[in-house]
Swiss-Prot record:
The gene is SD17. Glycans are attached at N41, N92, N116, N236, N251, N381. Residues 32-435 are extracellular. SUPFAM superfamilies: alpha-D-mannose-specific plant lectins, Protein kinase-like (PK-like). Disulfide bonds join C290-C302, C296-C310, C372-C397, C376-C382. Disruption phenotype: Reduced abscisic acid (ABA) sensitivity during seed germination. The active site is at D644 (proton acceptor). This is Receptor-like serine/threonine-protein kinase SD1-7. PANTHER family: RECEPTOR-LIKE SERINE/THREONINE-PROTEIN KINASE SD1-8, RECEPTOR-LIKE SERINE_THREONINE-PROTEIN KINASE SD1-6-RELATED. The modification Phosphoserine is found at S553, S648, S661, S820. Residues 32-151 form the Bulb-type lectin domain. SMART domains: B_lectin (SM00108), PAN_AP (SM00473), S_TKc (SM00220). Residues 341-422 form the PAN domain. Autophosphorylated on serine and threonine residues.
């Protein structure tokens, strides 16, 4: 009799086998017998599926890396890369455990990266595990930690991750930026914690310090806005014999926030917003001129809320008076009177300060300010002192023993700093107070006497005087405009009808004539609609650019007023710096910092010079212009619309850092103001937005349009005014749009970019820039992004970019543009500031 198979028994055995396999190999671990290969597309996922580890190749690169990214977030965001400086050259790569180490092998079975653990029992089995906080661990069979990725950060600090020093081993955990947004290899920027008596963070470019966080004051790093206390974020700073580290913890579930050093050197706090499905920038550093390291030199401090930005501490004077007058405070300040160190020295208190660089400090956390002051007076090297901890009214003592530098004053926040002064400087203060009291009594008597005399004179008046007031619509002469700007030899400038004084040095006409070789043609740098720009050299050797306004231009005087009023208020690394002005003998001149590499258009559209603009330089220029425009629109004290952004108005310094210039057509907007209307359209055709050129409506989105045109010009090396098809009906915008629609947009890229990159051609990065440029030049203003969004898109390859709509002014040439082409000026200089348009739709 034939037996019947026991299907139930077979199924039971099969089920047991499946369960055994499921539990024996966890998806968040890698055992000694397992491996990850690129070809298998296998990854390791953390228990709650927050993070994922695996191989990736950025954009269209052929290089492969082992990395960790957010799995729970739809936008691919990398937080750690293992072999960032040793990528796999092909898709044949393997991660496995070899001995006590994690090792990546290439196609020839050669190791390209390893955890490099030495010693230990190689016979003890080890396993790797990915945790929900993003940490990748290697443990032995006794659960002893052998290695963790948190000790080797790349460009991102996650929650529970430590940044700083392990004092026992001397190992320093630092953040280092990607080289570019598409290249994970080590970039030039780093963020690291320097150990001193009073530790603080630096952002460095190679070995040069760019930014200093200020020391930990018990609650936060004194100049880092991101350490403001919020209920869901807990910050921790530890300074002990074992470690000097900074970390943070998130108390709210399903909240993802990271500290990120981008490829442009900005340290950003980014938080994921589920509602918008995007990373939002909560803060970044460095942000303004005063964040730049030691911008005001020794014994000088910076104040971004006033002008000039650099000031000497009371009792000090500038080392270089002329450079100081020209707003270059880097030489710093020196004492007016030397310290006596005989017990008679005293202190001046500076409020709301970022404490100075702490490289040379002595810290005692057990004493208060009174004893701290006494110790400072006992030490002839002591230059200043302050509380070490601001909590509970302040405690502890920190003493500076060398020149103090890199200070700034805040409108809110900061802490008190006590700077040592000679007794003579303190005596001057006492004498001044006595003089003030005596003068007040004398002035009161004088005012009373003056009132009596004035009253008597008024009664003697026999006739009234009629003052003729000119019509406000009359064109004012150039001489009358001198009264609009009050400039004294002490360097104070005020706007008409306002009591606001702006520090602006006044230079003599004779001095400028000497500096420019009597305005020689050999010194001529360029010519615009309002005058000529000359190169000059002052007696101290400082090079300057002198903009001499044309006497024949009625609008040149308006431009002069506008430029003085606006640029004097602006301080940013990507904006040209106004050093002074000249109002003398009917002449009006503006004095700027001299920028060695002249304007962007002189490089971009010149066949010889353009060869020096490889893609990395062009990308840096794009980012710099975007940062400058973002500052104008969002971060400056007054919102400013430039209205004439173009290649010839972007200047380049010796390091090819771009600086936006020419603010003669700019307008100030209120914080709640979104757009304005004008009957006098000014700007340059080819860069003007449709709504501005046709209807006189301008806004921040008008500048965004100009930026988009400029971005596409930088990528293509072509002017927007040319025609780029056989029918001569497509300008640059139409040319790029057609190639975008056809899917062959890389054909618009300047061949120099391709030649300079060879095998490292960052296709994905360039495509992103083209797409961002098209977003900026969309026909409808409401469709264009704001500059803060542009910066995020430029700085992160993981940010989703919308599909662009049709650009404005992409086909043909307008009649007005045709008319303007008859000018004898070059196309890029042919502005429409001499044209007045009638706008029917008044708003």
């Amino acid at each position: 009799m034939r037996s019947v198979p026991n299907y139930h028994h077979s199924f039971f055995i099969f089920l047991i086998l499946i369960l055994f396999l499921a539990f024996s190999v966890s998806p968040n671990t890698l055992s000694a017998t397992e491996s990850l290969t690129i070809s298998s597309n296998k990854t390791i996922i953390s228990p709650s599926q927050i993070f994922e580890l695996g191989f990736f190749n950025p954009a269209s690169s052929s290089r492969w890396y082992l990395g960790i990214w957010y799995k729970i977030i739809p936008i691919r965001t990398y937080v750690w890369v293992a072999n960032r400086d040793n990528p796999l050259s092909s898709s044949n790569g393997t991660l496995k455990i070899s001995g006590n180490n994690l090792v990546i092998f290439d196609q020839s079975d050669r190791p390209v990266w390893s955890t490099n653990i030495t010693g230990g029992d190689v016979r003890s089995p080890v396993a790797a595990e990915l945790l929900d906080n993003g940490n990748f661990l290697l443990r032995d069979s006794n659960n002893r930690l052998l290695w963790q990725s948190f000790d080797f950060p790349t460009d991102t600090l996650l929650a529970e991750m430590k940044l700083g020093w392990d004092q026992k081993t001397g190992f320093n955990r630092i953040l280092r930026s990607w080289k570019t947004t598409d290249d994970p290899s080590s970039g030039e920027f780093s963020t690291k914690l320097e150990t001193s008596e009073f530790p603080e963070f630096y952002i460095c470019s190679k070995e040069s310090i760019l930014y200093r966080s200020g020391p930990w004051n018990g609650m936060r790093f004194s100049s880092v806005p991101g350490t403001i206390q919020v209920d869901y974020m807990v910050y921790n700073f530890t300074a002990s014999k074992e470690e000097v580290t900074y970390s943070y913890r998130i108390n709210k579930t399903n909240l993802y926030s990271r500290l990120y050093l981008n490829s442009a050197g900005l340290l950003q706090r980014l938080t994921w917003f589920e509602t918008t499905q995007s990373w939002k920038q909560l803060w970044y550093s460095p942000k303004d001129l005063c964040d730049n390291y030691k911008v005001c030199g020794n014994f000088g401090y910076c104040d971004s809320n006033s002008l000039p930005n650099c000031y000497c501490i009371k009792g000090f004077k500038p080392v270089n008076e002329q450079a100081w007058d020209l707003r270059d405070g880097s030489a710093g300040c020196m004492r007016k009177t030397r310290l006596s160190c005989d017990g008679r020295d005293g202190f001046t208190r500076l409020k709301r300060m970022k404490l100075p660089d702490t490289t040379a400090t002595i810290v005692d956390r057990e004493i208060g300010l009174k004893v701290c002051k006494e110790r400072c007076l006992e030490d002839c090297n002591c230059t200043a002192f302050a509380n070490a901890d601001i909590r509970n009214g302040g405690s502890g003592c920190v003493i500076w023993t060398r020149e103090i530098l890199d200070m700034r004053n805040y409108a809110k926040g900061g802490q008190d700093l006590y700077v040592r002064l000679a007794a003579a400087e303190l005596e001057d203060k006492r004498i001044k107070n006595e003089k003030i009291i005596g003068s007040s009594i004398g002035v009161s008597i004088l005012l009373l006497l003056s009132f009596v005399i004035f009253h008597f004179w008024k009664r003697k008046q026999k006739r009234s005087i009629t003052i003729q007031t000119p019509n406000v619509d009359q064109v004012r002469s150039q001489d009358s405009l001198i009264n609009d700007v009050v400039v004294s030899r002490r360097g104070y400038t005020s706007k008409e009808k306002k009591s606001e004084y702006l520090e602006l040095p006044l230079l003599e006409l004779e001095a400028l004539a000497t500096a420019t070789n009597n305005f020689s043609n050999d010194n001529k740098l360029g010519q615009g609609g309002f005058g000529i720009v000359y190169k000059g050299r002052l007696l101290d050797g400082k090079e300057i650019a002198v903009k001499r306004l044309s006497k024949m231009s009625s609008q040149g005087t308006d431009e002069f007023m506008n430029e003085v009023r606006l640029i004097a208020k602006l301080q940013h690394i990507n904006l040209v710096r106004l050093l002074g002005c000249c109002v003398d003998k009917g002449e009006k001149m503006l004095i700027y910092e001299y920028l060695e590499n002249l304007s962007l258009d002189s490089h971009l559209f010149d066949q010889t010079r353009s060869s020096n603009l490889n893609w990395q330089k062009r990308f840096d220029i794009i980012n710099g212009i975007a940062r400058g425009l973002l500052y104008l629109h969002q971060d400056s004290r007054c919102r400013i619309i430039h209205r004439d952004l173009k290649a010839s108005n972007v200047l380049l310094d010796k390091n090819m850092t771009p600086k936006i210039s020419d603010f003669g057509m700019a307008r100030i907007f209120g914080r709640e103001e979104t757009e304005a209307n004008t009957r006098r359209v000014v700007g340059t055709y080819g860069y003007m937005s449709p709504e501005y050129a046709m209807d006189g409506i301008f806004s921040m989105k008008s500048d965004v349009f100009s930026f988009g045109v400029l971005l596409l010009e930088i990528i293509s090396g072509k002017r927007n005014k040319g025609f780029y098809n056989s029918n001569r009906d497509l300008n640059l915008l139409g040319f790029v749009w057609r190639h975008w629609k056809e899917g062959n947009e890389l054909e618009i890229v300047d061949p120099i970019n391709i030649d300079s990159l060879s095998s490292k051609f960052p296709t994905h990065e360039i495509l992103r820039c083209i797409q961002i440029g098209l977003l900026c030049v969309q026909e409808r203003a409401e469709d264009r992004p704001v500059m803060s969004s542009v910066m995020v898109m430029l700085g992160s390859e993981t940010t989703a970019i919308p599909q662009p709509k049709r650009p404005g002014f992409c086909i043909g040439r307008s009649p007005l543009e045709a008319d303007s082409s008859s000018s004898t000026q070059r196309d890029d200089e042919c502005t429409v500031n001499q044209i007045t348009l009638s706008v029917i739709d008044a708003r």
